A protein has these predicted regions:
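Phosphate/nucleotide-binding beta-alpha loop and adjacent structural elements of enzyme active sites
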Residues: 1-332
């Protein structure tokens, strides 16, 4: 049984090697480092992380195994200036918004949000940083800043037109006082020509009176049916540029090849196949040979995953080349 992205590390690096410039992936709120899956792009990517914790960035820079991976000790928001950073029991829960103490009281899982003081930090915007650093256009933007994701997006409006996909932590309940919620983020991104593609890692918080063994705090796409799920509280949202999911959208083969890498890194199999097919059809010579080879390999991996019921019923425009003999996933 095959698991993982349908375009593996070898395939990713082969396709990325055809691009006119490396994939540029940015992680805002990068404590503990950029996602490991980004590193599978190898020399085909430049990876930049941002975090307000200068000590953490120094540690990550010292541990980086490639000069194409670096960390900036910068707090990003929607303006230049200073802001209050609210510290919490768990350093990963620090935010530019104060913890919602009512939520902490109701949900024992949020004890990590207990206030532990404040510090003043300098802030800037992603757009201002990109301009001053002469940064390449951003292809993948990941934001996990504990309720301040919309602030970062508002400070990135000049950068967003180049972005092909975003991965954001979103809250469905106010875990921080005054924070924007999922609906606010969704409206903003739709206004900027992105569509919601997938929700992942949905976290549900139980109430104070729930028994410990009935409190669900899952990582994955669903709450186990045998458990009390509690209230949906937060998760990760994957957004893609609207044209990525449009089988009738025409774009240069270089753009489609870039989209294939982006979709594969985010483990979006149907978009990976669609982009590979478009890229292969749009070029000739050695690039076409490489793309056709990786498309064939990706189809085989997709077919195996579908046979084992791991992820999807192929959409209509992909179904014809995924494999006519594959059985649809059984309900149940």
């Amino acid at each position: 049984m095959i698991s993982g992205p349908i375009l593996d590390a070898r395939g990713l690096q082969a396709v990325a090697g055809l691009l006119e410039r490396p994939i540029h992936a940015v992680d805002v709120g990068c404590r503990e480092g950029v996602p490991e899956r980004w590193r599978t792009l190898g020399a085909g990517a430049t990876l930049v992380g941002f975090d307000a914790d200068s000590d953490e960035c120094a540690r990550l820079n010292a541990a980086a195994i490639s000069t194409q991976e670096r960390y900036e000790p910068i707090a990003l928001s929607d303006s230049e200036g200073t802001a209050t950073l609210y510290l919490t029991a768990d350093p990963q829960s620090a935010s530019l918004y104060p913890p919602n103490l009512d939520a902490v009281r109701r949900h024992p899982e949020l004890a990590r949000h207990e206030p532990h003081g404040t510090v003043t930090v300098a802030t800037t915007t992603l757009d201002r940083w990109a301009e001053s650093a002469h940064a390449a256009p951003i292809d993948i933007l990941k934001i996990d800043v504990q309720g301040a994701e919309l602030n970062v997006l508002r400070g990135a409006q000049a950068s967003l037109p180049a972005v092909r996909a975003l991965e954001l932590e979103v809250e469905f309940q106010p875990l921080y006082a005054g924070q924007p919620l999922f609906a606010d983020v969704d409206i903003f991104l739709r206004e900027h020509d992105f569509v919601l593609w997938r929700l992942r890692d949905l976290a549900h918080c139980g109430l104070t009176h729930s028994r410990r063994d009935e409190r669900a705090f899952p990582v994955g796409d669903a709450v186990e049916k045998t458990r009390i799920g509690g209230q949906i509280s937060w998760g990760n949202a994957i957004y893609v540029r609207a044209e990525l999911g449009d089988p009738d959208s025409a774009r240069p083969w270089q753009t489609s090849a870039r989209d294939a890498c982006v979709a594969a890194v985010l483990d979006l199999p149907e978009l990976t196949l669609l982009a590979l097919e478009r890229a292969a059809a749009g070029t000739s010579g050695e690039p076409r040979r490489i793309l056709a080879r990786e498309l064939q390999r990706a189809r085989a991996r997709a077919n195996s995953r579908r046979l084992h019921g791991l992820f999807w019923e192929a959409p209509r425009h992909v179904r014809g080349f995924v494999g006519a003999r594959a059985r649809p996933r059984q309900a149940g």
